[in-house]
Each structure stands twice: as C-alpha cells, then as structure tokens.
Amino acid sequence: MSSPRAVVQLGKAQPAGEELATANQTAQQPSSPAMRRLTVDDFEIGRPLGKGKFGNVYLARLKESHFIVALKVLFKSQIEKEGLEHQLRREIEIQAHLQHPNILRLYNYFHDARRVYLILEYAPRGELYKELQKSEKLDEQRTATIIEELADALTYCHDKKVIHRDIKPENLLLGFRGEVKIADFGWSVHTPSLRRKTMCGTLDYLPPEMIEGRTYDEKVDLWCIGVLCYELLVGYPPFESASHSETYRRILKVDVRFPLSMPLGARDLISRLLRYQPLERLPLAQILKHPWVQAHSRRVLPPCAQMAS
C-alpha cells in the first residue's frame, strides 16, 4: 500500500499521546467485527497522525468505551483507481487474525459509500524510520532488542503461513515502551504453500530471488531482517547505490561492505542472513539464540503478553 520512504505514519509522539496510551490499559477494547456494525459516529476524531496516497490516519476514541485507536480512513475511489481492492481485502483478512505483542492490531473495520475505515492499535511513539532519521543510527542494545522482537513476531507469522515481504523501518511502529509493532500488511500474503512468485517490496530490501523472478518462500523475511539490522547500526541499507541498476547488481552479488565500526557479533548475524541461497539463511529460531542478540537485547514483554505466556 505504501511507497518506499513515503508511508502513512500511525503516531507522531506527543506528550498527550503517552497519557492516552496509558489510559488504554484500563479502557475496554473495541468489540470484534461480529459484535455489531460500527460507523464513524461511534468515534471522537482527534488530530491527524499521518497522510497517505489513499487516505489519512487520525487519533480517535470510541465514545462508548473511551478506548484510544488510530483510525485509518481510505478513499474507495483512490483504491479502485489503482486497482488495489484485492490488496486491501488481503491486508484486512491477514492483519485481523494476527495477535502478537509485536504486531500492530487491527481491531475492526467498516465502510460507507465513499470510505473504508480500519480501526488500528495506536502506536504512540510513531515510526521506527523517524527514530532512525533523528538518531542517524541506533546502538547495539536498541538494534538487538528490535531484531529479537521482529524475529519472534515473524516466527508467529510464519507459523500461520503469513509472509510479510516488506519489512523496513517505515513499516515498523513503536509502542508505548518503544517496542516494535509490525504494521502495513499490504504486501503480505497468506499462502498455505508458503511459495510465491510475485515482485513486491522495497528496492533496498529486495532479496535476490525476488529480483530474479524466482519462486520464493518465507525466507525472504530473513533477508529483510539482515538488511534492517545493517541499516539500524550503520544508518543506511547495505546495498544502497546511486542507481537502481547498481542496487540490483550489488544485491545479486550480495556485495555487502561492512564498516570497521560494525560490531563483530552483529556482522556475524548479518552475514548469516544475507545469503544468496535462501536455504543458507539463518532460521528465525537461530536468530533468537544468536550470541549477539542474547548479549545485547533488552526485550521486555508488555504485561498482557507476560500473562498469556
């Protein structure tokens, strides 16, 4: 749904935003889609959180329960004009069935004559991309924590036969405690066979098999974790070049240039993920057990997830 480096932002953090997020801990969550049909009149609409090609995202509160959400409002005319009805239905179908502390919840959805409304979890600290822009690069502890959260969330997705295919800083939001929330499932796909052959995703993050049009599976997400880890630590993606053709060439040759400042443990992890052959990439379970991740991650599960486990 989003173009590279231009995505809808679900939360530009404001001081009031954290208070609203805290209030949600005691507020009643939105009822499931089967309970009753919602309309826009059920919400108090607040400030805009972001704008995109197909619509806008607003901070909103359910009048009945006072539960704080991000309300994504999409224009049907724009979606139909781009022929993205199927992609939107797929995004809703997939995200509505995913419940994990590091995946942005889609609580409910409804539509009227002109718009489609997605009721999403509010991520008060906004995009990881914005944090990276502000800091230029992240330290080992922050990066390792994000990688552990991401690997755990993707393990959950892959167990449900869901491939995300577009992991990148713009599609990772930050919760109240700074925990990662995978968002934007517009490119993701649910496939029982876990094997696809369509081109999608962001150029800097595309794995070799997708560039070459080969059949691929869930291991495309492993490649993306490697690219993300590099970008978080260095400040730019490993294959970033002056032209698309040069980026493609470097990806296909797996031409990774590690700066001298790259920690050896992180370099080892990235090297095990950025492999031309998908079967050679480090599995998610091994990412979670990797010595560098184990040594530096400070992942803290939210209370609800701790109780569930």
Swiss-Prot record:
GO biological process: attachment of spindle microtubules to kinetochore; cell division; meiotic cell cycle; mitotic spindle midzone assembly; mitotic spindle organization; positive regulation of cytokinesis; protein phosphorylation; regulation of cytokinesis
Sequence segments annotated as region (Disordered): 1-33
EC id: 2.7.11.1
Domain of life from the UniProt record: Eukaryota
PANTHER family: SERINE/THREONINE-PROTEIN KINASE IAL-RELATED
Regulation: Okadaic acid, an inhibitor of protein phosphatase 1 (PP1), protein phosphatase 2A (PP2A) and protein phosphatase 5 (PP5), increases AURKC activity. AURKC is also stabilized through its interaction with INCENP, which also acts as an activator.
Induction section of the entry: Expression is cell cycle-regulated, with an increase during G2 and M phases.
Modification Phosphothreonine, positions: 198
Protein name as annotated: Aurora kinase C
Residues the record lists as binding ATP: 49-57, 72
Short name of one Pfam family: Pkinase
Reactions that this protein is recorded to catalyse: L-seryl-[protein] + ATP = O-phospho-L-seryl-[protein] + ADP + H(+); L-threonyl-[protein] + ATP = O-phospho-L-threonyl-[protein] + ADP + H(+)
Function: Serine/threonine-protein kinase component of the chromosomal passenger complex (CPC), a complex that acts as a key regulator of mitosis. The CPC complex has essential functions at the centromere in ensuring correct chromosome alignment and segregation and is required for chromatin-induced microtubule stabilization and spindle assembly. Also plays a role in meiosis and more particularly in spermatogenesis. Has redundant cellular functions with AURKB and can rescue an AURKB knockdown. Like AURKB, AURKC phosphorylates histone H3 at 'Ser-10' and 'Ser-28'.
Renumbered residue ranges of the record's region Interaction with BIRC5: 292-309
